[in-house]
Amino acid sequence: MTRIKINARRIFSLLIPFFFFTSVHAEQTAAPAKPVTVEAKNETFAPQHPDQYLSWKATSEQSERVDALAEDPRLVILWAGYPFSHDYNKPRGHAFAVTDVRETLRTGAPKNAEDGPLPMACWSCKSPDVARLIQKDGEDGYFHGKWARGGPEIVNNLGCADCHNTASPEFAKGKPELTLSRPYAARAMEAIGKPFEKAGRFDQQSMVCGQCHVEYYFDGKNKAVKFPWDDGMKVENMEQYYDKIAFSDWTNSLSKTPMLKAQHPEYETWTAGIHGKNNVTCIDCHMPKVQNAEGKLYTDHKIGNPFDNFAQTCANCHTQDKAALQKVVAERKQSINDLKIKVEDQLVHAHFEAKAALDAGATEAEMKPIQDDIRHAQWRWDLAIASHGIHMHAPEEGLRMLGTAMDKAADARTKLARLLATKGITHEIQIPDISTKEKAQQAIGLNMEQIKAEKQDFIKTVIPQWEEQARKNGLLSQ
């Protein structure tokens, strides 16, 4: 059993919500005035907040790109027909937010502001320029149009004005002045009974992170960001909501199943875990208080692995040493990964078997219950694995979601076996060689050479034009 020591700073935030399921912080923070304009250039605030700025800038040290498709080629099949089958890297430092969304193959290679596969909403978690544009043009004005339209405007990396009311006099004095800079996030928090203005300071810390580290979808003709929390925040609640509005992100090109793509639901999974239930916030673990050279405490903005600052994070509550806790986390991660792979294997077979049934003449009515099972199985799998830290945030919930995903995938395959038999197909459906990312992409008919060549041309020609225009308009520091 994990032993926990409670220090004075955390006693109320750890115990009271456990027994009363309410916010531990009786004090309420007044809503800070919204800025008339949002200053998106992060460098502007370096003189006022030098330690925070330098530590934020140090997220550029988290530069390694890890190709998740190369690590696990099954993903290519599960996302067949969707840009994630082209390119999917694990997350890295906030300093690369704009660079990575520009350079990923998923955003395509648009030639002009009206070109490309994705909407403006794909910028929404990448830059304080998003808050600036929403403040300037309103949400409808911001969301309107294609992703490429925002290229010359959204140029500063995720930073100060995403989380802080930087125009506040209190911010200039060194106060945090947290704010929800995305109105759609504020509405979502209100919908689940957590209005930001009435939340305690520690609750607000996690809500600010929850603007982006969250599941969302693109709603309506304008493709505006919305959180699917109307029926609740658990995987089944969101699944029910999506089914009710008949939403899908794309149709899998093999099984022709209308699919859901989970994003990065850290807020939902953290809420379901032991830390969230005890109000141990994102900040406590990922942005601890540290000392500068003069011995002054400040919040470390080099957001990263809590084990990198063990004495200031885990050791505030846990009595075990670093090695012991790392072992626990590694074991949880391995358990989740083992079940993840088993679910993926079932889903890969289900997609190819569904394709075989369709090729054999299966009707829409015959396929509907099978496709529902595939949709629900992959959604539950995806919500578990898209939250990269679920082995730490909510390992029990991760295993539960993956377990139900396995059940749904098995149901789909059982129904497929029966359906295929009615079409005279009783032999095992052969799966092509998908042992590497490249072979898997070839199996679903992707011309990766062309896709990569078009992207390289875009990077060399279009992005420099965007940056030149941004500098002319004073949006980038010279």
Curated annotation (Swiss-Prot):
One Pfam family matching this protein: Cytochrom_C552
PROSITE patterns per record: MULTIHEME_CYTC (PS51008)
Protein location: Periplasm
Binding site for heme c 2: C160, C163, H164, H301
Cofactor binding comment, as recorded: Binds 1 Ca(2+) ion per monomer.
Superkingdom of origin: Bacteria
Record protein name field: Cytochrome c-552
Organism this protein belongs to: Escherichia coli O157:H7 (strain EC4115 / EHEC)
